[in-house]
Amino acid sequence: MSFFDHLQKKGVGAIQAQKVQIRKVERKPSKVVSSSSSSSIAKPQRRLDTVSKPVAARRSASSASKPARHPQPRSRPPSRKRNTIEPTLFGSSEESDTDVSLDLRITKRARVSSSVEPDLHRRVRDTDAFSDGEAAFDMIHAADIISSKKSLGFNNAFGIEDGPIIVELQYPGAPQKERYQLVVPRDNDGFKPLDDIVQVLEIVSQNYISEEHLALFEDESNGLLRRLRRALSNTSLTDFLDGVKSYNETIQRLHQDGSISRHLDSKHALALPLVERILTQVYSRTVSPRVDSLRQYENGSDNVYGELLPRLVSKIFAETRLKSDQVFVDLGSGVGNVVLQAALEIGCESWGCEMMQNACDLAELQEKEFKTRCRLWGLQPGQTHLKRGDFLEVDSVGKILQKADVVLINNQAFTPELNHKLVNYFLDMKEGCQIVSLKSFVPAGHRIQSRNLNSPINLLSVKQKQYWSDSVSWTNAAGTYFIATKDSSRLKAFLESST
């Protein structure tokens, strides 16, 4: 969903300090990263804990081709088709629909860090996910996505004719595994199970494995990553299954001996690629299969769909210094992407309100799967609250705005009337509350004067910020956003100087 890994095509590059400058907007192809993992293997009708009869994958004679959203209830510009955060590892061509090809470059792990300031009060690990008594829970498996589409548009990976093969993938948190079908989409924009497996292993290596065990994953001769890359390069199903089995056993051992728990307990923040991977998994299992329902919007109204992509959202969190003991509110939360990102990346109490019913339905699906995914990854997010209705009329929203520390309003296409009504809500917000918007609520050149003393905008101190290209869903271009802080000191100073 880059919704939210640094491999997504939109909105996930490394966050850079923004300078006031003219920058040529260029579109760059997403980087190709290869890594993979999986678990117990089974035939279509049953799963096996071990591979009793290795299946030799046939190599094709032909060459293979190389391989979060944030809707807003009120007005949003029409969005471009959302790009999922899946790296382009596998694909199909007219010449070969079943073979697999990928970039096998070996890269040393770059230690990833959070884009926000460390919050020493935050504890990122979900202790329940690591308890022995963790019960089974409902989840949407990757295999369910394929099944829901009745396998249309997919070919079996590795050239297998009698399949598809099903594998199970172990996560670093709760012991429950996820089922995957080893298939390749005919449409390059379709769901890519192999890519998802690869990214899980890559993210686990980067964020859950301590230095003392790193060689198990990244040894250039026989590390788990290398073994899987070699298996994919050689189109060897047997080697791939063996590599996945070894990965699952390694994760289970590190989970049981406490290594993963200790590593997570040393952290006070989550890296953006990890956040994006989880949000992408949630989005691809809930929103993507139903995304057509979001295309219903009315131009010129307050109900237009559009998203702020994870990179920009993370930058906003950093700019506002949002912390885990604070309250975040998204007015016009769409399918809940930003609400979930705040709860996961920051760990804060996170609220959203949306009036478009289709978006609300999908937001509730995302929220449920989000909690499941956090358990699988062993992470403790902040509380999430999603409300239906007009945020100007929902009582609970008005009350939470009085406690809010950061409020996001994607008012890019709001009508002037709605923007004017919103300004009056700022009167009830607490001192120091920060309001982030794509259009400023304070006109350029505004000055406090005797004739406008009663205007709510006199309570706002505004800063203009820049975002780079591919930060929002409706355009590739760079742009600006605004952070308004409720600060009554300027108005008090004016009144004192006038007496």
Swiss-Prot record:
Renumbered residue ranges of the record's region Disordered: 1-96
Top-level lineage group: Eukaryota
Record SUPFAM superfamilies: S-adenosyl-L-methionine-dependent methyltransferases (SSF53335)
Compositionally biased residues, Basic residues: 67-82
Domain DOT1: 178-499
Binding site for S-adenosyl-L-methionine: 305-308, 328-337, 354, 390-391
Gene3D superfamilies according to UniProt: 1.10.260.170, Vaccinia Virus protein VP39
Example GO biological process: subtelomeric heterochromatin formation
Catalytic reaction equation(s): L-lysyl(79)-[histone H3] + 3 S-adenosyl-L-methionine = N(6),N(6),N(6)-trimethyl-L-lysyl(79)-[histone H3] + 3 S-adenosyl-L-homocysteine + 3 H(+)
The keyword Transmembrane helix belongs to this UniProt entry's keyword annotation: no
Family: Belongs to the class I-like SAM-binding methyltransferase superfamily. DOT1 family.
Other comments on record: In contrast to other lysine histone methyltransferases, it does not contain a SET domain, suggesting the existence of another mechanism for methylation of lysine residues of histones.
Protein name per UniProt: Histone-lysine N-methyltransferase, H3 lysine-79 specific
Source species of the chain: Coccidioides immitis (strain RS)
